[in-house]
C-alpha cells in the first residue's frame, strides 16, 4: 500500500507541488479562522462573523466560468500569476482597524475565494500533464491528506497568531504563503502544451462546452454527483454535532474539537490509502465503499454512546475522501486537455457548492427536529448513493460526439 506513496514522493513535481499545497493550506485555514474572530471582535456580530465563511465559499458558484480562463492560458503561468496577485491582495487587511473597515476584509476573502476556484481548476489540469497517470490516484490522495492536515492545524496557528499579534499579522502570513506557493509552481517542470489556437466563441458558449462534456460523460457524471451528495451528507452530519454533544453525549461544546480531530485523522488515512484502493477497485466501487463507511459513521454518531460516536467520527473521516478523490482522478483521466480547466471547475462546483446549502439546511433542521433524524438523513443519503453506484456497475466507454 505504501509503494505508490513512496513512488509519488520520489517524483520531483509531486514533491514540489505538495510543499506548495501544505504551505498555502496553512495560510488559508489560519486566515479563515482569524477572520471570523477578527470580525466578531470588531463588530460584536455573530452574523457578520459567519459571513466570513460565506465570502470564501460563494465564488465556487462561478466555477464553470472561472475555469474557462484555465483553458485559455498556460496553467503553470496562470498559477504563478494568480498566487502573486493574491499575495498582494492579502496585504490589504493590514488597513482594517474599525467596524467600518470589515467590508475590506469581506472583499479580500471573496477575491481569495475566486482565486482559489481558479487555481484549483488550473492545478487539476496542470497535474494531468506533470504527474504520470499511474500515480495520480496516490497523488490526489496525498493532496487530500495534506489539505485535511492543514485544516486541522492551520486554525490553531491562526488563533494563536491572532491572539499574540492581531489580524494583520495573520493576513501577512497568508500573503507569504501565496508567495511560497508561487515559488512552488515556478519550480514545477513539465512540458505543458500551449492552449489550442482556435476561433474563440463567447465566454458563455465555451463554459457550456465544459459543462456539456461532464454531464454527457457516463463515467464522470455519476461520480461527480456522488461527490456532491457526499458533501451534502457531510454538511447535514456536521451541523448536528453540537446538538449531539448537548443532548446525546452531555458534553461541553469544546468537545467538538475532539470529534473534529478524530474525523480529520480518518480523512488523512483515507487520503493516504485512496491510491492503493484505486489500483485494486473500480473507481465507482471505491466511491460506493467510501459513502457506505460515511453512512455507518453517521449512524454510529446517533447512538449517543461515546466510544461508538468517536468510532463513527473516524469512519466518516475515512470514507468521505474516497468519492472526492475518485471523482477528481477520473476527471483528469477522462477529459481532453483543452477542456480540463472548465470540466475540473464545473466538477468542483457540483461537488462543493451544495455544501453551503446543506450547512444552511442542517442549521435550520437541528433547531426543529431531533439531531438523530438529521444523522439518519445523512446516512440514508450516503447509503442510497452508494447502492446506486454499486448497482450501475462499470459504465460503457465514452464516445465523444462528432
What are these language model-derived features?
Residues 37-50, 91-114, 134, 138, ...:
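Membrane-interface helix-capping segments at transmembrane helix termini in multi-pass transporters
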Residues 186-212, 398-402:
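Flexible cytoplasmic inter-helical loops of multi-pass small-molecule transporters
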Residues 16-32, 55-68, 74-86, 104-163, ...:
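Substrate-agnostic recognition of the 12-TM MFS/MFS-like secondary transporter fold
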Residues 50-52, 61-66, 70-72, 76-85, ...:
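C-terminal transmembrane bundle of multi-pass solute transporters/carriers
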Residues 2-58, 212, 216-263:
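Helix-loop boundary and gating motifs at the non-cytosolic
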Residues 15, 19, 50, 80, 102-113, 119, 138-194, 237, ...:
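Hydrophobic alpha-helical transmembrane segments
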Amino acid at each position: 500500500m505504501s509503494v505508490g506513496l513512496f513512488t509519488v514522493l520520489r517524483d520531483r513535481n509531486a514533491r514540489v507541488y505538495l510543499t506548495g499545497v501544505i504551505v498555502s493550506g496553512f495560510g488559508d485555514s489560519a486566515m479563515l479562522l482569524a477572520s471570523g474572530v477578527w470580525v466578531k471582535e470588531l463588530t460584536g456580530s455573530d452574523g457578520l462573523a459567519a459571513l466570513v465563511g460565506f465570502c470564501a465559499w460563494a465564488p465556487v458558484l462561478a466555477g464553470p466560468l472561472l475555469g474557462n480562463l484555465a483553458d485559455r492560458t498556460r496553467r503553470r503561468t496562470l498559477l504563478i500569476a494568480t498566487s502573486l496577485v493574491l499575495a498582494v491582495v492579502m496585504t490589504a487587511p493590514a488597513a482594517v482597524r474599525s467596524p467600518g473597515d470589515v467590508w475590506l476584509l469581506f472583499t479580500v476573502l471573496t477575491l481569495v475565494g475566486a482565486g482559489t476556484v481558479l487555481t484549483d481548476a488550473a492545478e487539476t489540469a496542470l497535474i494531468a500533464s506533470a504527474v504520470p497517470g499511474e500515480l495520480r490516484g496516490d497523488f490526489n490522495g496525498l493532496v487530500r491528506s495534506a489539505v485535511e492536515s492543514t485544516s486541522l492545524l492551520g486554525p490553531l496557528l491562526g488563533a494563536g497568531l491572532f491572539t499574540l499579534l492581531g489580524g494583520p499579522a495573520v493576513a501577512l502570513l497568508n500573503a507569504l504563503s501565496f508567495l511560497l506557493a508561487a515559488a512552488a509552481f515556478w519550480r514545477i517542470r513539465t512540458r505543458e502544451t500551449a492552449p489550442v489556437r482556435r476561433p474563440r466563441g463567447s465566454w458563455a458558449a465555451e463554459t457550456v462546452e465544459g459543462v456539456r462534456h461532464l454531464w454527457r460523460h457516463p463515467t464522470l457524471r455519476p461520480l461527480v454527483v456522488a461527490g456532491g451528495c457526499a458533501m451534502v451528507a457531510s454538511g447535514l452530519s456536521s451541523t448536528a454535532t453540537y446538538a449531539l454533544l448537548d443532548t446525546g453525549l452531555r458534553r461541553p461544546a469544546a468537545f467538538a474539537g475532539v470529534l473534529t480531530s478524530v474525523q480529520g485523522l480518518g480523512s488523512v488515512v483515507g487520503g493516504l490509502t485512496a491510491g492503493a484502493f484505486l489500483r485494486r477497485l473500480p473507481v465507482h466501487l471505491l466511491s460506493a465503499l467510501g459513502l457506505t463507511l460515511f453512512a455507518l459513521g453517521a449512524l454510529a454518531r446517533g447512538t449517543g454512546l461515546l466510544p461508538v460516536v468517536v468510532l463513527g467520527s473516524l469512519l466518516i473521516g475515512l470514507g468521505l475522501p474516497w468519492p472526492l478523490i475518485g471523482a477528481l482522478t477520473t476527471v483528469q483521466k477522462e477529459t481532453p486537455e483543452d477542456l480540463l480547466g472548465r470540466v475540473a471547475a464545473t466538477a468542483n462546483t457540483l461537488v462543493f457548492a451544495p455544501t453551503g446549502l446543506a450547512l444552511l439546511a442542517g442549521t435550520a433542521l437541528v433547531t426543529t427536529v431531533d439531531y438523530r433524524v438529521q444523522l439518519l438523513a445523512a446516512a440514508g443519503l450516503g447509503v442510497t448513493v452508494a447502492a446506486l453506484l454499486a448497482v450501475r456497475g462499470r459504465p460503457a466507454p465514452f464516445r465523444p460526439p462528432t
